[in-house]
Amino acid sequence: MKKDYYEILGVGRSADKDEIKKAYRKLALKYHPDKNPDNKDAEDHFKEVNEAYEVLSNDDKRRRYDQFGHAGVGSSAASGGGAGAYGAGGADFSDIFSAFNDMFGGGGGGRGRGGFEDAFGGGQRRSRASAGIQGTDLKIRLKLSLEEIAKGVEKTLKIKKQVPCKECNGSGSKTGATETCPTCHGTGEVRQASKTMFGQFVNIAACPTCGGEGRIVKDRCPACYGEGIKQGEVTVKVTVPAGVQDNNYLTLRGQGNSGPRGGASGDLIVVIEEKPHEFFVRNGDDVIYSLAVSFPDLVLGTKVEVPTLDGAIKMTIPPSTQPETMLRIPGHGIGHLRGSGKGDQYVRVNVFVPKDLSATDKELLKGLRKSPGISPEAHGTGTEKSFFEKMKDIIG
């Protein structure tokens, strides 16, 4: 199973383009083949990062991926190794050149341009502007009946999640005061440079003091221990369209756990769980109902009442209906997820064979069995010669 693109880049589902670009540049630098020669794992990670960035940096592809997963973007992201080292697949060249500059040109504390940026006029270096740590995504399972799935439903759910601390308004500080991190000086990053025969390499990591925020809290709030978040309970409304299937999921952006100290909230991911049904078996947007009918009713025909997802209806069993016949009731299936209309209901007709019979019923059946009109031979069936009998006729 392919990895989730958001997990590959280490960002939440509500991440904006700048966060995605920043995560991509860090990971592209970390796993670049030139920095990890003869390292197959690093090469595979590099391809994954580029593939994820190609999809998530494109608004249309990201929308399709959020709605349909990997199936929504097909093979386009993987066709050329994503946004590979030489810009294949639609990645932003300035991101790649900036990563090369970090590796081969830019010093540990320098902010000037160099390397590929000098050669190709690369974009301006980013500056750190911390807005708190991204809250984590929250995943819940929502059980739905087939009737709810058939028509769509709105659910009101109570969920437990991390919410902003009321005592400090989510700042983590009693007074709301913060100061620049003395370790990274507000950048949120620490760099370690090393020189090799191939040039200078720079390893970039999140600052361990501030956790990558660039600022640290003064006068920590005693209610949340300076985190700015506490466990709480909220009510959310989830609108589920008709036609969803088991393990489909809906993403509610910004409805997940709140981020520490004013950080953006993660997403709420609602995974659909379809309850087993008492009567129906689902087949795509169609449903199948098994109906047991007595032998006389199969032969003579009858009208019966059958359940549907819209309530019970009357249907006709035509005379001489054979066992395992599928009778169709149009438009009584499940609403289509995409487009209008609904699937159908199929009624599988089975013959009912009683286990216990009275003496009278047995005599009636014995008399019926003697009637030549109900035997297979009378209707041209059951008299086919076997292969060996046919061979005997030919050989003589």
From Swiss-Prot:
Question: GO CC: one term?
Answer: cytoplasm
SUPFAM superfamilies to which the protein is assigned, alphabetical: Chaperone J-domain (SSF46565), DnaJ/Hsp40 cysteine-rich domain (SSF57938), HSP40/DnaJ peptide-binding domain (SSF49493)
InterPro entries, alphabetically? DnaJ, DnaJ_C, DnaJ_domain, DnaJ_domain_CS, HSP40/DnaJ_pept-bd, HSP_DnaJ_Cys-rich_dom, HSP_DnaJ_Cys-rich_dom_sf, J_dom_sf
In this chain, the CR-type zinc fingers fall at 152-233
Taxonomy, superkingdom: Bacteria
Question: What span is annotated as the signal peptide, if there is one?
Answer: none
This protein's UniProt keywords: Chaperone, Cytoplasm, DNA replication, Metal-binding, Repeat, Stress response, Zinc, Zinc-finger
Comment on bound cofactor: Binds 2 Zn(2+) ions per monomer.
The residues covered by the J domain are 4-69
Tell me the residue numbers annotated for binding Zn(2+) 1.
Answer: 165, 168, 221, 224
One GO term (biological process): response to heat
Q: Cite the repeat ranges for CXXCXGXG motif.
A: 165-172, 181-188, 207-214, 221-228
Cofactor annotation: Zn(2+)
Principal location: cytoplasm
Pfam assignment, any one: DnaJ_CXXCXGXG
Tagged with keyword Methyltransferase: no
The GO terms this record gives for MF are: ATP binding; heat shock protein binding; unfolded protein binding; zinc ion binding
Q: Cellular location of this protein?
A: Cytoplasm
Q: Where does Zn(2+) 2 bind?
A: 181, 184, 207, 210
Q: How does it assemble?
A: Homodimer.
Family note: Belongs to the DnaJ family.
Domain comment as written in the entry: The J domain is necessary and sufficient to stimulate DnaK ATPase activity. Zinc center 1 plays an important role in the autonomous, DnaK-independent chaperone activity of DnaJ. Zinc center 2 is essential for interaction with DnaK and for DnaJ activity.
Function (record text): Participates actively in the response to hyperosmotic and heat shock by preventing the aggregation of stress-denatured proteins and by disaggregating proteins, also in an autonomous, DnaK-independent fashion. Unfolded proteins bind initially to DnaJ; upon interaction with the DnaJ-bound protein, DnaK hydrolyzes its bound ATP, resulting in the formation of a stable complex. GrpE releases ADP from DnaK; ATP binding to DnaK triggers the release of the substrate protein, thus completing the reaction cycle.
Q: What is this protein called?
A: Chaperone protein DnaJ
Protein encoded by which gene: dnaJ
